[in-house]
Curated annotation (Swiss-Prot):
Similarity-based family: Belongs to the SHMT family.
Subunit organization: Homodimer.
PANTHER family: SERINE HYDROXYMETHYLTRANSFERASE (PTHR11680:SF50)
Location (main, coarse): cytoplasm
UniProt cofactor(s): pyridoxal 5'-phosphate
Name of the featured protein: Serine hydroxymethyltransferase
Chain positions with N6-(pyridoxal phosphate)lysine modification: 229
Organism: Coxiella burnetii (strain RSA 331 / Henzerling II)
Cellular component per GO, a single term: cytosol
Keywords associated with the record: Amino-acid biosynthesis, Cytoplasm, One-carbon metabolism, Pyridoxal phosphate, Transferase
Amino acid sequence: MYEPTLTVESFDSELAGAIRDERRRQEHHVELIASENYVSPRVLELQGSVLTNKYAEGYPGRRYYGGCEFVDIAEQLAIDRAKELFVADYANVQPHSGSQANAEAYMALMNPGDTLLAMDLSHGGHLTHGSPVSFSGKFYKAVHYGLNAHGDIDYEQAAQLAQEHKPKVILAGFSAFSGIVDWQRFREIADSVNAYFMTDIAHVAGLVAAGVYPSPVQIADVTTTTTHKTLRGPRAGLILAKANPELEKRLNSAVFPGSQGGPLMHIIAAKAVAFKEAMQPEFKTYAQQILKNAKAMAEVMKERGYTIVSGGTQNHLFLVSLLDKNISGKEAEAALGRANITVNKNTVPGETRSPFVTSGLRIGTPAITTRGFKEKEASQLAHWVCDILDDIHNEKVIADVKQKAHELCGKFPVYQELD
């Protein structure tokens, strides 16, 4: 049924209700999931634009369909801005997600059965870094390094494993590591075994773009990322690289036609405007505040007796180990959720529970910083988290924190006040 004037509200009240409720949840809950953020109204607008109607297989100026002259402009803007923002020589803005960007980079760099050396999932890596349940662990032989006793990346272990297994690709990147990666050291390890060096900066891309976290783009052969999280764009992927014409051709072919068909032009346009937003001076201030808020929260939780993996944070997130608290990550996530504080359970080094239960929490500050929280609010919030974890079955404490969280959110609306 095509009716240009019919709204979702009037046509599909069930779906409209779910979206309305989700918007209320986002307004009234404190978002501490490290991979989530709030996009700008401009990004929202473009994701619902008429560009969603256009098929555009191929690349700007080399399409398989006619009528692409205007989407070519949008995609070229996204490419040029990505290259400028990240100081890259090459950018492919077509990947639909970070996982697909990784798959496409692997396709360009490896053959099935080749060896991938990456960070262990339980130490802060990602499913697509060679987990046995992921395509990356099924199609490639994955070997993993982890963290040392000090909570830092064990570079010596990585170097030893590289010499032992001679991987085709060495990957540096993470989904739950709160330190700073020594990209150059990984470059040297990769060079020692003639491996490609690939980085996944999905979590810190916004921090890298703002210059508050070291960039690997001109150190690595290939860099992948998502465009949401700290970058605050649409949920999608991006591949970057330093100059290498042969590798650029392989990357383009791996994306299209290797693993994708028609690109999502409305999402690519949203990427373009998000990249422009990240070029503004205000974005650097935002990224700096993300770090300040994360440090403030981690310090409070340490003072309250909670173990922070790696001892603290130098980016937007930190891991709380509950191994010594007789609390599971699942229990903690649920209790905090009842108080309108959204976090995610996470595996931690020395994990004894299943990935569906875990012994830790991952906490991140990109979303609360977008709302306008500063150190005062971040510290206050950390105390509330500790209040609940200190007495996790005390529903009175949970109700009290819920009321405080609701009031705090009211002072910092995401988009606008709701009924």
